[in-house]
Amino acid sequence: RQRQMCIRDSYHSSYFEKNKGVWTHGDWIYISSEKGILMQGRSDATLNRNGIRIGTSEIYTVLDQITEIKDSLIIDIAVQKSSKLVLFISTKKTLDNEIKTKIKNAVKSKCSPRHVPNLIFSVSEIPYTISGKKMEIPIKKIVNGQKIDQAISKGAMKNPECLKEYIDIRNQYLKSPDQ
């Protein structure tokens, strides 16, 4: 019974929390005048950089070409009346200023200056669901201060042990009002 309640609550928060009473599934669609539907991409994998929408895949495509990076996850966080892009990466060697500069230059030249992350943190692992999806939205919720049990269903995670690192980063670097 308790498991059923947990599943129901998780289902509700996944699909009905963002727009009260409206099913929100995370895809952008276009409905034509002939009532045809065209899938245009994932809305939950979209960053909002001061009103400019950026697809995370644009940035991941560039990061995948940087040999020092094993894996990455990028989120946007609201800071006063602005937003910042926060990049988490697992690396093959220690993250230093040379790698950070390489990342910023590559993203700027292959995407745009608006795509460049403000903050870059090294983590041992990027969190994934059991089905292999990066957990961008739950990590964004955790970084913004939401409790883990409200942001993530650990049972749906491939690697829940990595969450402590993200909480530590939030508490150490991202908790001040100025961020």
Regions found by a protein language model. Give the residues of each.
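AMP-binding/adenylate-forming catalytic core of the ANL superfamily
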Residues: 13, 17-115, 125, 130, ...
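Short, small-residue-biased leader/transition segments that mark boundaries at the very start
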Residues: 2-7
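General small-molecule cofactor/ligand-binding pocket signal
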Residues: 120-123
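Acidic/polar alpha-helix N-cap and adjacent early helical turns
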Residues: 127, 142-179
